[in-house]
């Protein structure tokens, strides 16, 4: 069991989780994330082919504004588009084959550690599968988050 004593940065906490992970795939789900119906079965089915990363669609709500985020290896990171579609390269919330990204490290920081790690992991991708389903929801509220704004 890991206990959050708040003495470490978010990046070091994520790294500790990655270091003890033993499953074939890893994905990070935080308290502002919700996995939607069908997530586990869809990921397990897609993992049968052993791709380096499994991407999907996400509902993102940022300070009350909503967008659908489509993760895919063919995409660059677009700015959040309220009321529309936002295309992004794979992030840490996607399912990653642990062995493919084992050498990627989270930085000792409380902001942007997810993007730092994701950019490293993206360079390791040789194979991918995209699940064209809404499987994840991200809900950010500046009034309640503990994460610093960047």
Predicted regions mapped to residue ranges:
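Conserved nucleotide-sugar donor-binding
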Residues: 22-23, 89-104
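Glycine-rich, basic loop-to-helix element that forms the pyrophosphate-binding segment
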Residues: 5-21
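Acidic donor-binding loop at a coil-to-helix junction in glycosyltransferase catalytic cores
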Residues: 111-117
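The conserved acidic donor/metal-binding loop of glycosyltransferases
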Residues: 30-34
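Conserved donor NDP-sugar-binding/catalytic core segment of glycosyltransferases
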Residues: 40-69
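A recurrent flexible, glycine/aromatic-enriched loop bordering the glycosyltransferase active site
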Residues: 61-63, 75-96
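Short aromatic/hydrophobic "clamp" motif used to bind/position activated sugar donors
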Residues: 26
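Active-site donor/metal-binding and catalytic loop motifs
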Residues: 131-150
């Amino acid at each position: 069991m890991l206990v959050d004593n708040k003495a470490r940065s978010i990046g070091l906490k994520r790294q500790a989780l990655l270091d003890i992970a033993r499953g074939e795939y890893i994905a990070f789900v935080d308290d502002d994330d919700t996995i939607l119906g069908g997530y586990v079965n869809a990921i397990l089915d897609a993992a049968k082919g052993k791709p380096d990363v499994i991407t999907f669609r996400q509902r993102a709500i940022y300070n009350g504004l909503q967008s659908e985020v489509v993760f895919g290896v063919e995409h660059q990171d677009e700015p959040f588009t309220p009321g529309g579609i936002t295309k992004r390269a794979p992030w840490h919330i996607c399912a990653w084959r642990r062995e493919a990204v084992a050498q990627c490290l989270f930085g000792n920081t409380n902001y942007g550690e997810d993007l730092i790690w994701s950019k490293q992991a993206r360079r390791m991708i040789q194979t991918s599968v995209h699940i064209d389903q809404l499987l994840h929801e991200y809900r950010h509220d500046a009034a309640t988050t503990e994460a610093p704004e960047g």
